[in-house]
């Protein structure tokens, strides 16, 4: 879809605003780091526990992917006839229509073929 003049203008104005406000934003971020860096880190330590790298990797290995389900690669249906959860409804509807279209083709009786 083509970009409208309005969207181009808005993008241009946002870029100029970013340029104008960049020094103020930088100073604000630096002041946050200067004043409360130690205080913020203490709060984070209270909330979160720091784990060694080995333990973190071991915990990640426990996760299982959903590979137990047998899925048809062509139709993306699993053994229960369900589509994957990430597929949106329009895509499901389209695939279902294609599947049913193939089933509806009626065969001509043997005697009537000219």
From Swiss-Prot:
<feature type="region of interest" description="Disordered">
    <location>
        <begin position="1"/>
        <end position="23"/>
    </location>
</feature>
<keyword id="KW-0539">Nucleus</keyword>
<dbReference type="GO" id="GO:0001099">
    <property type="term" value="F:basal RNA polymerase II transcription machinery binding"/>
</dbReference>
<feature type="region of interest" description="Disordered">
    <location>
        <begin position="91"/>
        <end position="114"/>
    </location>
</feature>
<feature type="compositionally biased region" description="Basic residues">
    <location>
        <begin position="1"/>
        <end position="21"/>
    </location>
</feature>
<protein>
    <recommendedName>
        <fullName>Protein LLP homolog</fullName>
    </recommendedName>
</protein>
<comment type="similarity">
    <text>Belongs to the learning-associated protein family.</text>
</comment>
<dbReference type="GO" id="GO:0005730">
    <property type="term" value="C:nucleolus"/>
</dbReference>
<feature type="compositionally biased region" description="Basic residues">
    <location>
        <begin position="91"/>
        <end position="108"/>
    </location>
</feature>
<dbReference type="GO" id="GO:0005694">
    <property type="term" value="C:chromosome"/>
</dbReference>
<dbReference type="Pfam" id="PF10169">
    <property type="entry name" value="LLPH"/>
</dbReference>
<dbReference type="GO" id="GO:0097484">
    <property type="term" value="P:dendrite extension"/>
</dbReference>
<comment type="function">
    <text>Regulates dendritic and spine growth and synaptic transmission.</text>
</comment>
<dbReference type="GO" id="GO:0060999">
    <property type="term" value="P:positive regulation of dendritic spine development"/>
</dbReference>
<dbReference type="InterPro" id="IPR018784">
    <property type="entry name" value="LLPH-like"/>
</dbReference>
<keyword id="KW-0158">Chromosome</keyword>
């Amino acid at each position: 879809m083509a970009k409208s003049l309005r969207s181009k203008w808005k993008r241009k104005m946002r870029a100029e605003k970013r340029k104008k406000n960049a020094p103020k934003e930088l100073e604000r971020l630096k002041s946050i780091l200067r004043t409360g860096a130690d205080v913020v880190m203490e709060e984070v330590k209270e909330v979160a526990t720091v784990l060694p790298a080995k333990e973190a990797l071991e915990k990640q290995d426990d996760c299982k992917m959903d590979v137990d389900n047998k899925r048809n690669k062509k139709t993306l249906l699993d053994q229960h006839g369900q589509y994957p959860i990430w597929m949106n409804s329009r895509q499901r509807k389209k695939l279902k229509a294609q599947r049913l279209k193939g089933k509806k083709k009626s065969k001509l009786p043997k005697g009537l073929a000219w």
